[in-house]
A protein has these predicted regions:
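Short, small-residue-biased leader/transition segments that mark boundaries at the very start
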Residues: 1-2
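Mature extracellular/secreted ectodomains of secretory-pathway proteins
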Residues: 10-158
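Secreted, short cysteine-rich peptides and small extracellular cysteine-rich domains stabilized by multiple disulfide
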Residues: 160-208
Protein backbone atom coordinates (compact mmCIF):
# COMPACT_ATOMS: atom_id res chain seq x y z
CA UNK A 1 0.00 0.00 0.00
CA UNK A 2 1.29 3.42 -0.94
CA UNK A 3 1.79 5.45 2.23
CA UNK A 4 4.57 7.95 1.63
CA UNK A 5 3.28 11.44 0.93
CA UNK A 6 5.08 12.07 -2.33
CA UNK A 7 3.40 13.09 -5.55
CA UNK A 8 6.02 13.04 -8.30
CA UNK A 9 9.29 11.44 -9.40
CA UNK A 10 10.55 14.96 -10.09
CA UNK A 11 11.88 16.49 -6.88
CA UNK A 12 10.89 20.06 -7.80
CA UNK A 13 7.39 19.03 -8.89
CA UNK A 14 6.97 16.97 -5.74
CA UNK A 15 7.83 20.00 -3.61
CA UNK A 16 5.38 22.13 -5.62
CA UNK A 17 2.60 19.64 -4.90
CA UNK A 18 3.39 19.55 -1.19
CA UNK A 19 3.51 23.34 -0.99
CA UNK A 20 0.19 23.74 -2.80
CA UNK A 21 -1.63 20.74 -1.36
CA UNK A 22 -4.54 22.71 0.12
CA UNK A 23 -5.20 24.44 -3.20
CA UNK A 24 -4.89 21.15 -5.11
CA UNK A 25 -7.45 19.49 -2.82
CA UNK A 26 -9.96 22.19 -3.87
CA UNK A 27 -8.91 22.29 -7.53
CA UNK A 28 -11.61 22.15 -10.21
CA UNK A 29 -11.24 20.55 -13.63
CA UNK A 30 -10.58 23.85 -15.43
CA UNK A 31 -7.84 24.71 -12.94
CA UNK A 32 -6.17 21.35 -13.49
CA UNK A 33 -6.05 21.96 -17.23
CA UNK A 34 -4.72 25.49 -16.69
CA UNK A 35 -1.56 24.06 -15.07
CA UNK A 36 -0.55 23.30 -18.66
CA UNK A 37 2.29 20.89 -17.89
CA UNK A 38 1.50 17.18 -17.70
CA UNK A 39 4.11 16.34 -15.05
CA UNK A 40 2.72 18.99 -12.69
CA UNK A 41 -0.79 17.90 -13.64
CA UNK A 42 0.04 14.28 -12.78
CA UNK A 43 1.37 15.35 -9.38
CA UNK A 44 -1.85 17.24 -8.71
CA UNK A 45 -3.85 14.20 -9.81
CA UNK A 46 -2.01 11.97 -7.34
CA UNK A 47 -3.12 14.37 -4.59
CA UNK A 48 -6.75 14.46 -5.83
CA UNK A 49 -9.55 12.70 -4.00
CA UNK A 50 -11.65 10.12 -5.86
CA UNK A 51 -14.37 12.60 -6.80
CA UNK A 52 -11.88 15.05 -8.32
CA UNK A 53 -10.41 12.21 -10.37
CA UNK A 54 -13.82 11.06 -11.54
CA UNK A 55 -14.87 14.57 -12.58
CA UNK A 56 -11.62 15.08 -14.48
CA UNK A 57 -11.97 11.88 -16.51
CA UNK A 58 -15.65 12.50 -17.21
CA UNK A 59 -14.87 16.01 -18.41
CA UNK A 60 -12.12 14.74 -20.70
CA UNK A 61 -14.32 12.04 -22.25
CA UNK A 62 -17.33 14.33 -22.63
CA UNK A 63 -15.14 16.85 -24.46
CA UNK A 64 -13.71 14.03 -26.58
CA UNK A 65 -17.23 13.01 -27.54
CA UNK A 66 -17.80 16.44 -29.10
CA UNK A 67 -15.17 15.82 -31.79
CA UNK A 68 -15.93 14.45 -35.25
CA UNK A 69 -16.71 10.74 -34.84
CA UNK A 70 -18.85 8.14 -36.54
CA UNK A 71 -21.91 6.93 -34.63
CA UNK A 72 -20.10 3.71 -33.76
CA UNK A 73 -17.13 5.66 -32.39
CA UNK A 74 -19.39 7.94 -30.34
CA UNK A 75 -21.11 4.91 -28.87
CA UNK A 76 -17.75 3.38 -28.00
CA UNK A 77 -16.51 6.52 -26.22
CA UNK A 78 -19.83 6.72 -24.38
CA UNK A 79 -19.21 3.23 -23.01
CA UNK A 80 -16.20 4.57 -21.09
CA UNK A 81 -18.33 7.38 -19.70
CA UNK A 82 -20.98 4.90 -18.54
CA UNK A 83 -18.28 2.71 -17.01
CA UNK A 84 -17.04 5.62 -14.90
CA UNK A 85 -20.52 6.84 -13.95
CA UNK A 86 -21.65 3.36 -12.90
CA UNK A 87 -18.67 2.64 -10.62
CA UNK A 88 -18.80 4.88 -7.58
CA UNK A 89 -15.56 3.49 -6.10
CA UNK A 90 -13.61 3.30 -9.33
CA UNK A 91 -11.12 6.04 -8.41
CA UNK A 92 -10.86 5.20 -4.73
CA UNK A 93 -7.22 4.40 -3.98
CA UNK A 94 -8.29 1.91 -1.31
CA UNK A 95 -10.30 -0.16 -3.78
CA UNK A 96 -8.65 -2.33 -6.44
CA UNK A 97 -10.10 -2.59 -9.92
CA UNK A 98 -12.45 -5.58 -9.96
CA UNK A 99 -12.29 -8.31 -12.60
CA UNK A 100 -15.47 -7.16 -14.33
CA UNK A 101 -14.16 -3.62 -14.80
CA UNK A 102 -10.73 -4.90 -15.79
CA UNK A 103 -12.28 -7.08 -18.49
CA UNK A 104 -14.51 -4.23 -19.71
CA UNK A 105 -11.50 -1.95 -20.15
CA UNK A 106 -9.53 -4.65 -21.98
CA UNK A 107 -12.46 -5.36 -24.30
CA UNK A 108 -12.92 -1.64 -24.91
CA UNK A 109 -9.34 -1.32 -26.15
CA UNK A 110 -9.50 -4.45 -28.27
CA UNK A 111 -12.75 -3.34 -29.94
CA UNK A 112 -11.24 0.08 -30.66
CA UNK A 113 -8.20 -1.57 -32.23
CA UNK A 114 -9.83 -4.40 -34.15
CA UNK A 115 -13.28 -3.08 -35.08
CA UNK A 116 -12.91 0.70 -35.19
CA UNK A 117 -9.34 0.46 -36.53
CA UNK A 118 -8.05 3.10 -34.15
CA UNK A 119 -4.28 3.26 -33.91
CA UNK A 120 -2.36 2.91 -30.66
CA UNK A 121 -1.75 6.63 -30.39
CA UNK A 122 -5.46 7.45 -30.46
CA UNK A 123 -6.29 4.73 -27.94
CA UNK A 124 -3.53 6.01 -25.66
CA UNK A 125 -4.78 9.57 -26.06
CA UNK A 126 -8.29 8.63 -24.96
CA UNK A 127 -7.87 6.07 -22.18
CA UNK A 128 -4.37 6.53 -20.77
CA UNK A 129 -4.34 10.24 -19.97
CA UNK A 130 -6.94 12.83 -18.91
CA UNK A 131 -5.35 15.37 -21.25
CA UNK A 132 -7.74 16.83 -23.79
CA UNK A 133 -7.59 15.99 -27.48
CA UNK A 134 -7.50 18.82 -29.99
CA UNK A 135 -9.77 19.09 -33.04
CA UNK A 136 -7.44 16.71 -34.90
CA UNK A 137 -7.79 14.11 -32.12
CA UNK A 138 -4.22 14.63 -30.99
CA UNK A 139 -2.71 15.48 -27.63
CA UNK A 140 -1.07 18.86 -27.15
CA UNK A 141 2.63 17.99 -27.22
CA UNK A 142 3.55 21.36 -25.71
CA UNK A 143 2.34 20.06 -22.33
CA UNK A 144 5.42 17.83 -22.07
CA UNK A 145 7.70 20.52 -20.66
CA UNK A 146 9.10 18.99 -17.50
CA UNK A 147 11.15 15.78 -17.20
CA UNK A 148 9.13 13.18 -15.31
CA UNK A 149 12.07 11.85 -13.30
CA UNK A 150 14.46 14.81 -12.99
CA UNK A 151 16.32 14.87 -9.67
CA UNK A 152 14.21 12.02 -8.42
CA UNK A 153 16.85 10.75 -6.03
CA UNK A 154 18.99 13.80 -5.33
CA UNK A 155 19.60 14.51 -1.64
CA UNK A 156 17.21 11.73 -0.69
CA UNK A 157 19.71 9.27 0.73
CA UNK A 158 18.41 5.73 0.20
CA UNK A 159 14.93 6.90 -0.70
CA UNK A 160 13.66 5.27 -3.88
CA UNK A 161 11.94 7.31 -6.60
CA UNK A 162 8.23 6.78 -7.06
CA UNK A 163 7.24 4.40 -9.81
CA UNK A 164 5.51 6.31 -12.61
CA UNK A 165 4.18 3.71 -15.07
CA UNK A 166 2.54 0.29 -15.28
CA UNK A 167 4.69 -2.40 -16.90
CA UNK A 168 2.15 -5.23 -17.02
CA UNK A 169 0.75 -4.54 -20.46
CA UNK A 170 2.07 -5.63 -23.83
CA UNK A 171 4.83 -3.51 -25.34
CA UNK A 172 2.48 -2.66 -28.20
CA UNK A 173 0.75 -0.04 -26.08
CA UNK A 174 2.11 3.40 -25.29
CA UNK A 175 2.83 3.08 -21.59
CA UNK A 176 4.37 6.35 -20.50
CA UNK A 177 3.76 9.02 -23.11
CA UNK A 178 3.81 9.33 -26.86
CA UNK A 179 7.59 9.65 -26.66
CA UNK A 180 8.60 7.27 -23.88
CA UNK A 181 6.99 3.95 -24.76
CA UNK A 182 8.82 1.59 -22.42
CA UNK A 183 8.06 1.02 -18.77
CA UNK A 184 10.69 -1.02 -16.97
CA UNK A 185 10.37 -2.51 -13.53
CA UNK A 186 13.25 -1.07 -11.58
CA UNK A 187 14.25 0.33 -8.24
CA UNK A 188 11.22 2.44 -7.45
CA UNK A 189 8.47 2.59 -4.86
CA UNK A 190 5.26 0.94 -6.08
CA UNK A 191 2.00 2.90 -5.85
CA UNK A 192 -1.37 1.17 -5.78
CA UNK A 193 -2.94 3.38 -8.48
CA UNK A 194 -2.36 6.37 -10.80
CA UNK A 195 -0.98 4.55 -13.87
CA UNK A 196 -2.27 2.59 -16.86
CA UNK A 197 -5.80 2.80 -18.26
CA UNK A 198 -7.83 5.65 -16.75
CA UNK A 199 -4.88 5.94 -14.34
CA UNK A 200 -6.49 3.14 -12.29
CA UNK A 201 -3.65 0.66 -12.11
CA UNK A 202 -0.54 0.04 -10.08
CA UNK A 203 2.55 2.11 -10.83
CA UNK A 204 5.31 -0.50 -10.76
CA UNK A 205 8.02 0.76 -13.12
CA UNK A 206 9.89 3.75 -14.46
CA UNK A 207 9.55 5.31 -17.90
CA UNK A 208 12.63 5.08 -20.11
Amino acid sequence: VYKRQDYSCNKEVNQWAKSNLNEIKKMKVAEWYSINDIVYQKAAYVAFDSNQRKELWLSKLQETLKLDWTNAEKEHISKLIYLIEDNSNLFDNKVSVDDKTDLAIYQWKEYALEQLRWDHELIFSIIKTPEKLNANKKLDTSLYKTPATKNNSESDGNKQPLCNCNSNESHKWFLCSLWFHKCHIGVCEVRSKDCGDLWLYECNGLCV
